[in-house]
Amino acid sequence: MLRNTLIHCFFFFSLYGFSQSNDTTKVVKRIYQTNPIQDKEAPTIDGVLDEAAWDLVPWTADFIEKEPDENTPPSQQTKFKIVYDQKYLYVGFRCLDTEAEKIEKRLSRRDGFQGDWVEINLDTYHDKRTGFSFTITAAGVKGDEFISRNGNNWDGSWNPIWYTATTIDEEGWWAEIKIPLSQLKFGKSKEQIWGLQVTRRLFRKEERSVWQRVPQDAPGWVSEFGELHGLLNIEPQKQLEIQPFGVTQLDTYEAEDGNSFRDGEDFKLNAGIDAKIGITNDLTLDLTVNPDFGQVEADPAAIALDGFQIFFEEQRPFFVENKNIFDYRFANNADNLFYSRRIGRSPQVNASTTDDDFTDLPKNSTILGAAKFSGKTKKGWSIGVLESVTSRELGTIEDALGNRREAVVEPLTNYFVGRLQKDFNERNTYVGGIFTSVHRDLGDQLLIDLDNQASDESSELAGLRENALASSLRQRAYTGGLDFRHNWKDRNYFIEGNFVASHVEGSAEAITETQTSITHLFQRSDASHVAVDSSRTSLTGTGGKLTAGKSGGGNWRYDGGFYWRSPELELNDIGFLRQADEIQQFANLRYLFLRPTKFYRRAEVALNQYSTFDFEGNYNFIRYHLFGFINYKNNWWTEVGFGHKPRIYSNTALRGGPRWRSSDDTYAFLFFGSDQRKKFNFTVGYDGSRAAYNDYTFDRFVVRLNYQPLDALSVSFNPELRINKDKTQYVTTEDFGETPRYITGNIEQNTLSASFRINYTINPNLTLQYYGQPFISRGRYSNFNYVNNPLAKKLSDRIALYNPNQISTRDDEYVIDENNDGQEDYSFDNPDFAFVQFRSNLVLRWEYIPGSEIFLVWSQGVNGDGDTSNKLLKSLDNQILGQKPENTFVLKVTYRFIL
């Protein structure tokens, strides 16, 4: 282990010296001088710059090409002006075009960024890391994003209120925008200096030109902006917006005989309120009471055979907006101290029922209210505080006699997140911290008899009066962290790190369940450094990461470092943690081809390596990966990669059993696509892997088809096929006398999915969108076996196959007579599965005035278990097209008051 670690360190640090000579190209910062309107009439936003106010400042031009041929004159020039008053910032653009008839005027929803567009970015904090982006297309479609991490993150969920108009003439096109200062954040000073950048996209040539040159080898985006001067005596505007909403919802479905909960339809009325209150210009308080997210698309279907939880992206507007402030990813991309999907999650406790019972269970926990205090001050303080309360959720159970009772399936819960960062050293350094807490009200009463029939309660139901909540859920959970980043040498080099700690408390049963969960698996039979302690009522763990590298300057980029997650680290109450008990070392190297040639516009090659260990010192995994990307001159592209995993050991494959060795694995992928600007474009790809001796194979085939027959209409169809074959897929654990048997089998799993989208933009404020996704996954098992030597190199030595005399079937289970004495030793259920699902959304969205919307939504869903003997396409016909779907119709109306 030590030898390999030294080799990897040498591999990384040798690159450091190799790359030191590459420096970022020095560029002079441009300055734009604006003027106030004062006694002039404010511009009317109509796409015609004919008001006298525009004569207060000259045009600024001299744009420079950024893509594809950086630092050359662009094909078409661009000019702009900026003026302001005490309430608004006004920007006028003149996008010259010698072939005005070829201007692309594609329509889309907000943030679609289709066709020709022009964009202004404002770093109002002048922190060289964050900014506000406003984009307007030639067709008049808005785009707006909040920029963070020096251009590495663009958050399209930020939707401020602003105004725009465009016109087209024989010399090009005009754009005019008006931005309320209340939608921007800046400090109070006599003269403001903001970072400024303007970018234009010439669609037909896929050319981008900029006002302030940003070299291709620059270490970021916002840090390279020019400056906006002349903003005198403008007062920060406190934002005050209140947005009430009302929702009606009708659910229809096939009625079930005898089930009073499923009579064919349900009708609901709901109302709530959202608000934005500017505490200062820098800091905003967001409030939501009884929020509704009926217009949000459902999550894509997925099946996890490895037992781990699946990470789903946040789509709910309240939690998406300003999420960058609360982001605290400390190890890999998913591990985070704050995973907002925990708030309003599906109930975690199952109501105890019999086969004759009917149930009515909530799909999600109700968010009673949430408050978010966030922003960034002129002095470099980033602040984020979030508080939310979800209600106590009850499931209703009805027995065969019609008696009803209620069971608590989710307790009243309070969630808190606090985040703080401070910039130093001319914004080249920051340090920060985070704290989270979760408190659950785990009361004693779980069962409520609605018919006052406690005296007739069966012994089975009486057992439910024990506090199942306390035995299943942790009562309190706390996490905290510190992080930092330092950049030097014009931000070309960096070092960053973080440290996290967690502490969870609960009953002995709840903490035992935590210890034995897939994240921890303290019950592993061969682990000497962890063990289940059923008397414990708390766990405390740590984690962290340290990375250093080169992010700009010349053609080379690299970084390397390590992270760790201790065995007792637990984040899943309000964060996301897939696996604890891991230490990882990593090294990455990239080479960027910065200058286009006759063959390509841009290209890159990357090599990376990482190794993992556990806290017992076991060397578990190593991977080498080579990646290449090329964007050809005609805007087609290819992405290719391959890698090798010569060492694969898993502490989780046997779900609490001993450490397991897998055969060496080699994988590859190839994707290529056509010019995405064309009316019809496509992407096709393949990725797959092969283990030694074909112990494991995986193949995935991907097609992405996009067609835009009209400027206002686009259609996409994205089918995908996955074929997974594994000779040792874990099935279950059974006892053979005093010996546990870890049973695996040969699985052949085929998964077919597709997504289908239609977007029709009637005008920039009125859109119709359809989304549909069929999903079918079928898994068949054979050649069942048990593990007898989990660390053997060859598969045949790792497992023992059951022979025909040892295994037989009974009903829907397998019966094992391992010692051939004619008696059943143990049995397990048939693990074959066929899951079928169809989801669709049809959404009509009308922004009837800026910030106020009407949504009409029609959602459909079909879920079921298919026939494992059917072919995939037959399951599509029988289980989806042949079933009556569940329908949901939603009307949601919002109105935004700006006070």
Q: Each predicted region: which residue ranges?
A:
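Alpha-helix capping and helix-loop boundary segments enriched in small/acidic/polar residues
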Residues: 262-263, 306, 361, 404-411, ...
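Structural preference for beta-rich elements and adjacent junctions enriched in aromatics
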Residues: 20-423, 432-433, 453, 467, ...
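Bacterial Sec-dependent N-terminal signal peptides
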Residues: 1-24
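Exposed, low-structure sequence patches enriched in small/polar residues
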Residues: 366-368, 374, 490-899
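Surface-exposed extracellular loop regions of Gram-negative outer-membrane beta-barrel proteins
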Residues: 235-286, 415-530, 595-597, 603-609, ...
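Short amphipathic alpha-helical segments with coiled-coil-like heptad repeat character
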Residues: 52-60, 185-187, 294-299, 306, ...
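A generic secondary-structure signal for well-formed alpha-helical elements
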Residues: 92-93, 97-99, 128, 181-185, ...
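Short acidic, glycine/serine/threonine-rich loops at helix termini
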Residues: 208-210, 298-301, 395-399, 443-447, ...
